[in-house]
Amino acid sequence: MKFEDLFKKKTAPVTDTADVTGETPDECPNSDTDTKQKEKSLDQVAPKSIGVLDMVIAFDTTGSMAAYIGAVRQEVSELIPRLFEDNEDLRLGIVAFGDYCDMKNPQEFGKAYQCIMPTDNQDELVKFVKRSKDTSGGDSDEFYELVIKKIVEETPWREDANRVILLISDATPHPVGYTFKKYVVNNQIDWREEARKAAQMKIKIDTVTITDEPWYKELSQMTDGMSVPFESGAKTARLVEAATWSRGSKADRLKFDRLMEECSDKEMQEVFTAYMSERMKCDDDDC
């Protein structure tokens, strides 16, 4: 795809495969019976094949949002192995992004869009997070519309995978028609159109409600993703664990349940509850 084509309105139909360009509960389980009952329940909700997970975590690195990926950098060497230890079918991608003003020039993103495609190469993921650069952002909006478009269209999603984007951000997308110097002129990327493409490709987009901007909940609703109450940058690694394990292998989901039962942090309780609600919905719908 040519660079300038990213900002043009696309009318081609979307297919299922993207082109590749580049407080604690009252009682915790303490017996074999509890464990067997939980495993039986998970067999209904999480058959072995559902552990196939392609997940892209997209970090806004502008201004104060840099603290979120910064918190992950501090423990990434331990975090990444934990995410993979019980799921050989996990592929994880990471995007660190800024805004148009952070681009190297009108034809090169530079540090404005840094990414590693979904992979199970843990060393490369750790290296990417440690080497990713923070950005400044030039106005109240950020180029979320472009980030969504690029991740949806350029990620080599596996056909049988559960496809998820976790967007960790706090601002709003640029509107259609936005211009910034020569970097983008009369931008034709509409985030709602990109969300519809994601939904057609069965890509869920999870968002975090760091602010009360309504577009986050709308984005998640449009793509059948989760809008998760979350504010504290220092807990970002815990958020990533919850988002990954809630849709991972049976072992991952048991780990998620155990952490939820043991959790006493109010904010993380809300995160766990949000992801558990998806599990319950899936159970009710027999999906």
Placement of each model-derived feature along the sequence:
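Divalent cation-coordinating acidic motifs and surrounding scaffolds
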Residues: 2-287
